Amino acid sequence: MSLDLLLRGAVLVTPEGERRADLGIVGGQIAELTDEIATPAAQTLDVSGLHVFPGVLDDHVHLNEPGRTHWEGFETGTQALAAGGATSFLDMPLNSSPPVLTRERFEDKARLGEEKSLIDFGLWGGLTPLNLDQLDDLAECGVIGLKAFMSHSGLDEFPAADDLTLYEGMRTAKRHGLVVATHAESNEFTRRLTETARAQGKSGVRDYLESRPVVTELEAVQRALLFAQDTGAALHLVHVSSGAAVALAYEGKQKGIDVTIETCPHYLHFTGEDVERVGAALKCAPPLRDPAVQEELWRELLAGHIDTVGSDHSPAPPDMKTSEDFFSLWGGISGAQSTLNVMLEDGYAQRGLPLEIIAALLALNPAQRFGLPQKGRLAVGADADFALVALGEKFTLDTLYDRWQQNPYRGQSFQGRVHATYLRGQPVYQNGEFTGTPRGRLLRPRSL
């Protein structure tokens, strides 16, 4: 046997920790991992001085194709992801138009992804009052899970799931072994607070932040946990913004509820004070919190109570992010390129978070949660998906690859630059260049 590619002098970030070893690849998979590989190779790459991370599996991305490619599409979105060390992502059922609520919409988006995506991808299906009768079909065609909003999504074509819809959707998901992801904010609470603020003529940044307090997240998390406990469904709480909500969900996990917890890099890197300074580029829901709440979130992460960190990349054209009325602006942050950067800077460099924990949060844990055993780790038999990172290199992020440049991470200083990203042993990104043609494949989950 000969290898297709041999990495020499690597520092591998494995589930057990950092390991100096060689890595051999055959047919897109890791074939050897040992201190010194003697097997001949068609190509040998000296990666001395670099860390080899498992490719990021971003479990929360909005690429909006078809229908809203002018917001973000597979081509530009996956370039940004690859430049940030990602080799796989899970695309949300909105904001493509129409959203992924049926088998037909799933198949349309899957076809476009296989034509255009640089990296591998899975597709979430929607869970709304409009498509309860379509969930069996979506499960059969291979959705990675079902996504529900417990508050208004911002798009009328993807309405919020009322309590019965969410409950029945969880029962269906349980039957198919699928995860249900929830945007957990109280619909009634946030709607009434928003109406009251606007009736009083309030329209500023702080007015918006105060219209979605932490308690609106806690109330929705509690309900989602109750429904998951009663149905036995697997629950994934997305973009959790507060330490209190993490603690509540983790308590449920300790009681036996099948729940995982995702937060996002913007909640870890920016605060509500930054929103007041930066403006529209940092509007999201749940909103960014005050510094004390952010520190509580970090404490929960450092305690091991958070399972995944996903970008929630959700850009929009500049005209949707320009208004004197902050309530009317599109809520979404461009962050596909920066998740690993944030975790290396704010987690590893500033707080001593071990590299293997970062790799678990960004790769291993989402791969395990969503039934993707070939992904998420550097191990013999796994797909040869990895990023080459100069861990000690400090830089300012000034080159971005997503469609719109209204990006809050521009100009931020980070430690740990991604030099290259490899998908199944082939480079897709190298030092500012994208190599080859789109080669992304559709990922379908194995039964949980």
Swiss-Prot record:
Q: Where is the signal peptide?
A: none
* Modified residues annotated as N6-carboxylysine in this record: K147
Key words of the record: Hydrolase, Metal-binding, Purine metabolism, Zinc
For the keyword Protease, the answer is no
Q: What is this protein called?
A: Allantoinase
Question: Its family?
Answer: Belongs to the metallo-dependent hydrolases superfamily. Allantoinase family.
Q: Does the keyword Zinc apply?
A: yes
